[in-house]
Swiss-Prot record:
UniProt cross-references to CDD domains, sorted A to Z: beta_tubulin
Role this protein plays: Tubulin is the major constituent of microtubules, a cylinder consisting of laterally associated linear protofilaments composed of alpha- and beta-tubulin heterodimers. Microtubules grow by the addition of GTP-tubulin dimers to the microtubule end, where a stabilizing cap forms. Below the cap, tubulin dimers are in GDP-bound state, owing to GTPase activity of alpha-tubulin.
Family from the record: Belongs to the tubulin family.
Quaternary structure, from the entry: Dimer of alpha and beta chains. A typical microtubule is a hollow water-filled tube with an outer diameter of 25 nm and an inner diameter of 15 nM. Alpha-beta heterodimers associate head-to-tail to form protofilaments running lengthwise along the microtubule wall with the beta-tubulin subunit facing the microtubule plus end conferring a structural polarity. Microtubules usually have 13 protofilaments but different protofilament numbers can be found in some organisms and specialized cells.
Protein name: Tubulin beta-1 chain
Keywords recorded for this protein, A-Z: Cytoplasm, Cytoskeleton, GTP-binding, Magnesium, Metal-binding, Microtubule, Nucleotide-binding
Binding site for Mg(2+): 69
Main localization of the protein described in the UniProt heading: cytoplasm
Organism: Triticum aestivum
Annotated GO CC locations: cytoplasm; microtubule
Pfam families: Tubulin (PF00091), Tubulin_C (PF03953)
Source organism phylogeny: Eukaryota, Viridiplantae, Streptophyta, Embryophyta, Tracheophyta
Length: 445
């Protein structure tokens, strides 16, 4: 079957990742010891996308956990589902990356990377037909960003034809953990543009806003934020794990969402988001889901889709519903808001339907959009980067690990190129495209 190998790195990646496994285990009826306690055959039908079945009948996640310090790993191991992972798949160093991308990418991380790759190979050999990899990491720290991108480039070399999907937590605009986030994030984006196929962009601030505004939580914890992320992660892959009327996989997703190879950074959303108390009082309908899903307040990264245009988008519905109604709603959205979609990609919204809803809901939907407005986020990080780099602030931490200033300059210009590419396609109109073609024809004559 089409397996996906899950890799989580750094503190953020491990925390998101372990939350994700709680959700997926719950959906497939697998208890914290790896035994199946579910009620429906559908839970087991494609359980091998994310799990190996051990000889004793236990299910073991296809997960590789890495970090440069033991702390977060220990808390995963002692957490609710800590005993389900294969002990050999915990790979950790002792030194820590200290929020330094260079340590994660060149020094400390480079020493540990071979042992991580060994585990990845072992897991990949266990697969029948490996579809791809999903990596959870943050771009602001040292391990997830530096070592995460190192691992992605190594896997790219070894498995060039497999999909590489990342769930990347970007530094948020107002809430900053460390002062060097803009450096780490820019260096990481430089890598992700080249080596990843699809990046789901998340950011803490947008997640805080959702918890605060929509879920009415007064003091959201990281656990609450990660719960939102895990709902989305589970939604992205539900088509692979459960039967559906309109299935999609990572490759189909990429083909439908990526018009130009470098523009593969997506905003994600999830519906229904209602506060825990009010869930039971609201009926769920396809139009309601659709409306909430396209709402800019629902996006899990700090960019406003109303400031740009959608190149493409994909909606994954879960639950028993009529596909006709789904299609009608999607067409409706496009017709009503046609100015927010580029007109030179007709039918640029794809939908898929999976029959099994998430636990506790009758229907749900996951939204993935490729919008030019995501440049706001890159632009913001880039401005912060330039402000510090112009003064060469904090650079010695990076050059001390053997990095060259040249690399910073390259990463900066790559990110600025990305921003202007998004801008170029945001401004492009169908008539312009037509004019080019005519000119070319004349030249050929």
């Amino acid at each position: 079957m089409r397996e996906i190998l899950h890799i989580q790195g750094g503190q953020c990646g491990n925390q998101i990742g372990s939350k994700f496994w709680e959700v997926v285990c719950d959906e497939h009826g697998i208890d914290p010891t790896g035994r199946y306690v579910g009620t429906s055959d559908l839970q087991l039908e494609r359980v091998n996308v994310y799990y190996n079945e051990a000889s004793c009948g236990r299910f073991v996640p296809r997960a590789v956990l890495m970090d440069l310090e033991p702390g977060t790993m220990d808390s995963v191991r002692t957490g609710p589902y800590g005993q389900i992972f294969r002990p050999d798949n915990f790979v950790f160093g002792q030194s820590g990356a200290g929020n330094n991308w260079a340590k994660g990418h060149y020094t400390e991380g480079a020493e540990l990377i071979d042992s991580v790759l060994d585990v990845v190979r072992k897991e990949a050999e266990n697969c029948d037909c490996l579809q791809g990899f999903q990596v959870c990491h943050s771009l602001g720290g040292g391990t997830g960003s530096g070592m995460g991108t190192l691992l992605i480039s190594k896997i790219r070399e070894e498995y060039p034809d497999r999909m590489m999907l990342t769930f990347s937590v970007f530094p948020s605009p107002k809430v900053s953990d460390t002062v060097v986030e803009p450096y780490n994030a820019t260096l990481s984006v430089h890598q992700l543009v080249e080596n990843a196929d699809e990046c789901m962009v998340l950011d803490n601030e947008a997640l805080y806003d959702i918890c605060f505004r929509t879920l009415k939580l007064t003091t959201p914890s990281f656990g609450d934020l990660n719960h939102l992320i895990s709902a989305t992660m589970s939604g992205v892959t539900c088509c692979l794990r459960f039967p559906g009327q309109l299935n999609s996989d990572l490759r189909k997703l990429a083909v439908n969402l990526i018009p130009f190879p470098r523009l593969h950074f997506f905003m994600v959303g999830f519906a229904p988001l209602t506060s825990r108390g009010s869930q039971m009082y609201r009926p769920l309908t396809v139009p309601e889901l659709t409306q909430q899903m396209w709402d800019s307040k629902n996006m899990m990264c700090a960019a406003d889709p109303r400031h740009g245009r959608y190149l493409t988008a994909s909606a994954m519905f879960r639950g028993k519903m009529s596909t006709k109604e789904v299609d009608e709603q999607m067409i409706n959205v496009q017709n009503k808001n046609s100015s927010y979609f580029v007109e030179w990609i007709p039918n640029n919204v794809k939908s898929s339907v999976c029959d099994i809803p998430p636990r506790g809901l009758s229907m749900a939907s996951t939204f993935i959009g490729n919008s030019t407005s995501i440049q706001e986020m890159f632009r913001r990080v880039s401005e912060q980067f330039t402000a510090m780099f112009r003064r060469k602030a904090f650079l010695h931490w990076y050059t001390g690990e053997g990095m060259d200033e040249m690399e910073f300059t390259e990463a900066e210009s790559n990110m600025n190129d990305l921003v202007s590419e998004y801008q170029q396609y945001q401004d492009a109109t169908a008539d312009e495209e037509g004019e080019y073609e005519e000119e070319e024809e004349l030249e050929q004559e």
